[in-house]
């Protein structure tokens, strides 16, 4: 897109967050007004001051939203230290890979759909649906009698989890002004970071003390509480969209191509070099057809979709592309710490599952604190660029230091390096989302947020696969050295060290030390890769522009009629631009 065209877009389209477009001077008033318009029964609240009602409802709603995000994030990592026990229970090393990957793959593939569903049917109904699906998936996981049943249930969890995070971020964007939402998005980011980091600790505690099934049972009461709070206290206007008409408006072709393309591409990465050689027909076909489907998805969104899942107009600004790239690289790097640090502590340091979770507490605490502090900083200053630069710089330093983790690393090094990496993790959970929302209309908040989280989820899934591939391929290069381990050599050389940590700990001391050193050496190139990706993310921040965050609020219209109205407005804008160009020529 040319620079002149971009300027024309900027001139013809007012800042969607400008005071002239604001419908309210405070989010409390907007929230109270939505209560009046909502189909929910608010009669029990009559007679109370509106401002007090708004404050109470917002506080309770935020608790419910944070619980929903906590669940989605917790299940991203809770199984990481439980995977060896799950693999042993089902006598399946494949479970070590697929129980974790099924959640991430489904999470990534489903995310774009939730944003458009929320636009058509409303935020609250879709959030409740995601909660219900997550509860069903959790129950089936806990009751699984074979690995196939468990993997399928994890996929259901993943699809629902993608909706939980996307819809919560969207609702925050609906309720608060740009300046204010930075604080609340920071809170959500802090909850997400802490839950991701607590996952291995909670999973390790259940695996060691009770059973791995409690990694899924624990979701049921939390999910039930979140569902109840959201149902009774989150007051949002729900459109009365006819079910059949609403489903007819969904971009089914785009949904098919984005889900199919995402899954095929990620399956190709998952299989490559492990299950099948990289040059095998299976891997090549999956990768090629996955890319083809994604290209076809772009074509459908551009030319055919009336209500696109990922509208291409989101990418017309350099700022938006930069924010999405920063989100991609941040997620790619952040994910590695909470997937592979537990592996390091179990396989190299000989820790039990619960201790592996405890040993990553320095990264847990520093990540959560820095994420929440970033939200407060953005809310107070309106500046989101400083946290982005600071966070990525600290990630480069922190993950670069992790390269030095070896079998003999002392506790001072293990703690300090994790603290630095964790401080770098926090700032870019939500700062790029704030940057993205400065250049999109309020009517595009849901699709923009869904696109943002889709990019993050794709990065997470690719990160886990890329780390596994690099780690396992490094171990294969050490086959001759590992032959000294006897029967255990084949397990480690095949990349199954994570699923066989107990076998490694049972080796005689000389062989055990050799195995642990080999695993640490295999992890080192992986940290080099993640450090390089953090550096790439730092450069991408240069694409992000500085925009003043407004303190005014605009109420988001949802429903099929609102979608039609927004589309008509965009069509009128395009026609006005074309007419202006014709007059100039």
Curated annotation (Swiss-Prot):
Gene Ontology CC: plasma membrane; vacuolar membrane
Phenotypic consequence of gene deletion: Decreases the expression of ver1, pksA and vbsA, and subsequent production of dothistromin, but does not affect the resistance to the toxin.
Species of origin: Dothistroma septosporum (Red band needle blight fungus)
Similarity section: Belongs to the major facilitator superfamily. TCR/Tet family.
Any one GO MF annotation of this record: transmembrane transporter activity
Official protein name in the record: Efflux pump dotC
Membrane topology summary: Multi-pass membrane protein
Xref: Pfam families: MFS_1
Record: glycosylation sites: 10, 91
Keyword Membrane among UniProt keywords: yes
Organism superkingdom: Eukaryota
Span list, region Disordered: 1-45, 564-585
Keywords assigned by UniProt, alphabetized: Cell membrane, Glycoprotein, Membrane, Transmembrane, Transmembrane helix, Transport, Vacuole
């Amino acid at each position: 897109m040319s620079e002149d065209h971009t300027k024309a877009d900027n001139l013809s389209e007012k800042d969607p967050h400008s005071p002239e477009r604001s419908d309210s001077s405070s989010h409390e008033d907007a929230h109270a007004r939505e209560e009046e318009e909502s189909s929910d029964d608010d009669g029990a609240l009559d007679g109370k001051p509106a401002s007090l009602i708004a404050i109470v409802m917002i506080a309770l709603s935020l608790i419910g939203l944070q619980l929903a995000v906590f669940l989605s994030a917790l299940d991203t990592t809770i199984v990481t230290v439980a995977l060896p026990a799950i693999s042993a229970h089902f006598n399946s090393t494949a479970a070590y890979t697929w129980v974790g990957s099924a959640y991430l793959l489904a999470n990534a593939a489903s995310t774009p759909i939730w944003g458009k569903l929320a636009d058509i049917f409303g935020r609250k109904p879709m959030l409740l649906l995601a909660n219900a699906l997550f509860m069903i998936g959790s129950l089936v996981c806990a009751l699984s009698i074979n690995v196939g049943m468990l993997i399928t249930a994890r996929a259901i969890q993943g699809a629902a989890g993608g909706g939980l995070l996307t819809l919560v971020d969207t609702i925050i964007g609906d309720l608060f002004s740009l300046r204010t939402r930075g604080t609340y998005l920071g809170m959500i980011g802090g909850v997400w970071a802490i839950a991701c980091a607590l996952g291995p600790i909670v999973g390790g505690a259940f695996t060691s003390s009770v059973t791995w099934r409690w990694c899924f049972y624990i979701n049921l009461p939390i999910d039930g509480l979140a569902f109840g709070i959201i149902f009774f206290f989150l007051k949002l206007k729900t459109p009365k969209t006819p079910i059949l008409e609403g489903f007819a408006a969904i971009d089914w072709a785009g949904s098919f191509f984005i889900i199919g393309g995402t899954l095929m591409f990620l399956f190709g990465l998952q299989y490559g070099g492990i299950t099948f050689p990289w040059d095998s027909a299976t891997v090549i076909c999956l990768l090629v057809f996955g890319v083809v489907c994604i290209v076809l998805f772009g074509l459908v969104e551009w030319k055919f979709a009336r209500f696109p899942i990922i509208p291409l107009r989101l990418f017309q600004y350099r700022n938006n592309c930069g924010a999405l790239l920063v989100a991609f690289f941040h997620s790619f790097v952040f994910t590695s710490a909470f997937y592979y640090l537990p592996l390091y502590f179990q396989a190299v340091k000989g820790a039990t599952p619960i201790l592996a979770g405890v040993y990553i507490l320095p990264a847990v605490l520093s990540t959560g604190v820095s994420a929440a502090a970033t939200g407060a900083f953005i809310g107070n200053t309106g500046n989101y660029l400083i946290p982005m630069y600071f966070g990525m710089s600290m990630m480069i330093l922190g993950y670069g230091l992790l390269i030095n983790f070896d079998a003999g690393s002392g506790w001072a090094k293990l703690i300090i390096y994790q603290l630095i990496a964790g401080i770098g993790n926090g700032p870019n959970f939500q700062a790029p989302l704030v940057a993205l929302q400065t250049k999109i209309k309020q009517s595009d908040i849901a699709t923009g947020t869904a696109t943002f989280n889709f990019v993050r989820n794709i990065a997470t899934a690719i990160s886990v696969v890329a780390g596994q591939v690099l780690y396992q391929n490094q171990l294969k290069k050490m086959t001759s050295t590992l032959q000294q381990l006897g029967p255990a050599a084949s397990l480690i050389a095949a990349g199954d060290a994570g699923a066989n940590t107990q076998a490694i700990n049972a080796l005689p001391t000389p062989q055990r030390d050799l195995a642990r050193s080999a695993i640490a050496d295999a992890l080192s190139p992986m940290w080099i890769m993640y450090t390089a990706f953090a550096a790439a993310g730092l450069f991408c921040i240069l694409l992000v522009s500085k925009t003043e965050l407004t303190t005014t609020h605009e109420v988001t219209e949802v429903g099929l009629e609102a979608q039609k109205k927004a589309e008509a407005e965009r069509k009128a804008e395009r026609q006005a631009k074309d007419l202006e160009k014709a007059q100039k020529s």
